[in-house]
Amino acid sequence: TRHEQSAAFMAESYGKLTGKLSCCLSTLGPGATNLLTGVADANMDHSPVLVLTGQGSSNRLHKESHQIMDVCNMFESVTKWTTSIRNPSTIPERIGKTRSCSHRFARRHC
């Protein structure tokens, strides 16, 4: 899409209409903040959405650095579960937990 907010709303709509896990992604910083409204809507509608955002290198976290922010903290109040992946070997486990959460909390509206 041309804008992350559109991606979040499209993922929310797909999840809401099908009950299947959908996904949206963004770059770090402003890209992640642009997802926030659509993700909050998905959470309120119990739509299963996996949200992936970029992040700067771990040595830049918790410092004043261009476009670095605490994305997990920002999304915590509008998601069922949030995590940060710092080691690629944990990706399968984290995706598995995401799928488990999506099945528990999803409900069809249409």
What positions do the PLM features span?
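N-terminal alpha/beta PP-like core and its mobile active-site loop of ThDP/TPP-dependent enzymes
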Residues: T1-C110
